[in-house]
Amino acid sequence: MSELDYYQVLGVSRTASQEEIKRAYRKLVLKYHPDHNPGDKNAEQKIKNINEAYDILKDEKKRSAYDQLGHQTFKNSGGGNYQQHHGFTGGIDPNDIFENIFGDFMGARRSSKTAFSKKAGANLKYDISLTLEEAFYGVTKIISFKTALTCEACTGKGSLDNNSTSSCPTCRGSGVTRSQQGFFFFENTCQTCRGAGHVIKNPCTKCYGEGRYINTRNLEVKIPAGVKEGSRIKLTGEGEAGSRGGKTGDLYVCITLIPHNTFSVDGNDLHCQLDINCTTAALGGEVEVTDITGSKLKLKIPAGTQNNHKLKLSGKGMQILHSDRCGNMIVHVNIKVPKSLTKSQRELMIKLDKELNEASEEGFLSKVRNFWTSGSE
């Protein structure tokens, strides 16, 4: 049987980054998981090959050894060379050789092997888009996503009874296997028990001993009033389920605000544009504006208001998170000049322009006279 090319198994290049390897692994696991391919022996074999390849390539030391020496690096039969050149005659397990040399170290390793039997679930991130009104009032959303869920059949233990584990026959309870190439020893996570040091004699038929399985989850998320663009809501214990009773990860819901037709957001303030005519700007007056709640508000325009002037409506802005207060509503004034005039309107504008210019000239001449008069006294 030909040996697997671990890079081909995961569908990545030999220069792939760890992130690319991890992404490829997750994609393949979802595709060939037994829950999605019940009774498919080919899918079962592919999952085994995928796990084997990922176990080597995810570890930089193992990957480097594999790149240099290939599969021979991870074969226990490699110990034959060591025995032949040093007078050993059969029956010698590379594990025994390794433990004789590094016994104290491995003793410490064995004492912590239970850490491998439980694996914490990963934290998850979910992006959600809200309208500005939803962010203002707060909203409850139902989100749907694929993740690892705790197996109900075995309550996450991975076994169908409470006493179904035994020492792993491959690594003899150490959680690791050792191989030797020439004078070099290599240590790898045991493929049989995946580092746990024990195997399940009566594995759960639903999760295949994992204590979890992949499925779609629907979750109700309550989003508080006042969230902003980029706000992140942490839902403790709502992430990926742990393996064989491991701690469940957390879920982070990340907020994106959909652009609004009227308002833009700056901190807790809402900004909007208001068009007024030139006579209202000159004479002043009162106009009506609509806030984020849809309420109509009266806004006073001071006489002599200039273009791009900003007017503030206090407390009419965005809801402040975890507070009963609101920011301000900032109204930006745009003075609109008429594009066409009737004959009478044009005559009035010419008359007004003449009077304004005369008033301006009189004001200037008056200032000159006053200057010279005061200077001669």
From Swiss-Prot:
Give every J domain span: 5-70
Q: Which Pfam families match?
A: DnaJ, DnaJ_C, DnaJ_CXXCXGXG
Instruction: List the CDD domains hit by this protein, alphabetically.
Output: DnaJ (cd06257), DnaJ_C (cd10747)
Q: Which residues cross the membrane?
A: none
Keyword Transferase carried by entry: no
Q: Which GO molecular function terms does the record list? A: ATP binding; heat shock protein binding; unfolded protein binding; zinc ion binding
Q: Indicate which residues the UniProt annotation says bind Zn(2+) 2.
A: 168, 171, 190, 193
Compartments reported by the entry: Cytoplasm
- List GO BP terms, alphabetically: chaperone cofactor-dependent protein refolding; DNA replication; protein refolding; response to heat
NCBIfam families the UniProt entry points to:
DnaJ_bact, PRK10767.1
- In Swiss-Prot or TrEMBL terms, this protein is called Chaperone protein DnaJ
Q: Taxonomic classification, please?
A: Bacteria, Pseudomonadati, Pseudomonadota, Alphaproteobacteria, Rickettsiales
What would be the name of the gene that encodes this protein?
A: dnaJ
